[in-house]
Amino acid sequence: MTDLVITSPANQRLKDLLTLRRRRVREDTGQSLVEGLEETSLALEAGVLPQTLFHCPELMLDVPAGAALVERARAAGAEIVELGRTAFEKVAYREGPDGILAKVPSPGRSLAEVDLPEGALVLLCEGVEKPGNLGAMLRTADAAGVSLIIAADPVTDWGNPNVIRSSKGTVFSVPVAAASTDQAWDWLAAKGVPVVATTPETDVVHTDADLTGTVAVAVGSEKYGLTELALARSTHRVRIPMVGRANSLNVATSAAIVVYEAVRQRRAD
């Protein structure tokens, strides 16, 4: 069967594709866009089947692995659509695209679908606004073997193109979910998972907390930190010691510090 070829940037399918840049459309359709060879490859490796894979041979000249990825997607049952350069650049989200773009099921699941393994390490992000921070936390979670990331009262969604891009595609390899703050804490409480909240308002340093066993590490929004509700419902509070003039760290940095302390403690046991 011959692949569909689209050369006109005004093609209706491309216009429809562009609507997936809007969160509401992603939520209504359950579809998102993943762009780039690395990100799309990781999605496929994680078992995500693209509905459609768009590729531009002209832009893939410097990406030899691109052709192999197209064939992998074809073998997995994805529709393959070839785009001319102008058409591809119309729908590409990033500058200097490499000629690979896929329409995939949006990442994320409901908490009801999640089974935590024994000794699970959970990262709980409440009210995080910037997609880049969520992406950075995903990369940390992937590297550290985090079992689940929960976005509580998220300002953005897991299918945001900037989340996918900044995560380098790890949004597909790390289990992710979204819920309200109450729902997230209720679910963790029902599972018997203690929540360790990060806040400057405590004397307990993160290295002195017991982060072995099943535990959730909670971080809050970039501007306000964790809400009073989240702090009140958490089991423990810890702070990261700081000796400089700045009174706070980037939320993704804070998450990485505490998550890797949990990893260190588990290896020491």
What are these regions (language model features)?
Residues 49, 76-78, 97-98, 118-120, ...:
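Short coil/turn connectors at secondary-structure junctions
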Residues 23-24, 115-123, 233-243:
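Glycine/charged-rich beta-loop-alpha catalytic/anionic-binding loops adjacent to active sites
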Residues 6, 32, 126-127, 152-153, ...:
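Glycine- and other small-residue-rich loops at beta-strand/loop junctions that grip anionic moieties
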Residues 38, 45, 72, 81-86, ...:
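RNA substrate-binding interface of SAM-dependent RNA methyltransferases
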Residues 102, 140-144, 155-170, 228-269:
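Structured adenosyl-cofactor binding patch, chiefly the S-adenosyl-L-methionine
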Residues 1-93:
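N-terminal positively charged helical leader segments and presequences
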Residues 196-245, 250:
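Active-site/ligand-binding-proximal alpha/beta "capping" segment
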